[in-house]
Amino acid sequence: VIIAEASLEKLLVEDVMRLGAHGYTVTDVRGSGASGTREGIWEVDRTVRMEILCEGTVADVIAEEVMRRYATNYGLSLYFTEVDVLRPEKY
């Protein structure tokens, strides 16, 4: 899961697909943390949550690239979680 400034959405989509993801889901989110409160009222204040179901090795590559390219200059959080997929043929 990647939580990032909405301005990164297009770049993140390009990155995760290029790095081996078969798909993703993006939703608008709001919250508060180290980067301040993001309420999504203004376009520049929007935050997105990108969920990617993929093999662990692909997740590692995506996380390394996202951290390398964006973590220094953008509000960004990433985390891994293990899931049980009910329709594995889709992934």
Which ranges hold each PLM region?
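Positively charged, small/polar-rich N-terminal and surface patches that mediate targeting and assembly
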Residues: 1-91
